UniProtKB/Swiss-Prot annotation:
Belongs to the universal ribosomal protein uS10 family. GO terms for molecular function: structural constituent of ribosome; tRNA binding. This is Small ribosomal subunit protein uS10. It comes from Xylella fastidiosa (strain Temecula1 / ATCC 700964). It holds the Pfam family Ribosomal_S10. Part of the 30S ribosomal subunit. InterPro entries: Ribosomal_uS10 (IPR001848), Ribosomal_uS10_CS (IPR018268), Ribosomal_uS10_dom (IPR027486), Ribosomal_uS10_dom_sf (IPR036838). The lineage of its organism: Bacteria, Pseudomonadati, Pseudomonadota, Gammaproteobacteria, Lysobacterales. It comes from the Bacteria. Gene3D superfamilies: Ribosomal protein S10 domain (3.30.70.600).
Length: 103
């Protein structure tokens, strides 16, 4: 697997969960002898929603809710077969979305 990189993008609603998962990936890759760059934090996407509390006639009474989506990216440089096998067997938390791209 000469001159190849593995790009791993993580996405989650909980920042502690995503940091723990990124740490597990980094530890697994380093244990197999690969070089890791990251985790690199990407911009957080914040979605806000405003809801009227009163059923009618009181426009000033509102509640605001927000959802934050945290993202991280990792690059594994010069992966070997052991690295790929270890990453495939790795169990991450249920709330983390993982996208893997081989370049």
């Amino acid at each position: 697997m000469a001159d190849q990189k593995i790009q791993i993008r993580l996405k989650a609603f909980d920042c502690r969960l995503i940091d723990r998962s990124a740490g597990e990936i980094v530890e697994t890759a380093k244990r197999t002898g690969a070089h890791v760059r990251g985790p690199i934090p990407l911009p957080t996407k914040i979605e806000r929603c405003t809801i009227l509390v009163s059923p009618h006639a009181d426009k000033d009474a509102r509640d605001q809710y927000e959802t934050c989506t945290y993202k991280r990216v990792l690059y594994i440089v010069d992966p070997n077969d052991k690295t790929v096998d270890a990453l495939m067997k790795l169990e991450l938390a249920a709330g983390v979305d993982v996208q893997i791209k081989l370049t």
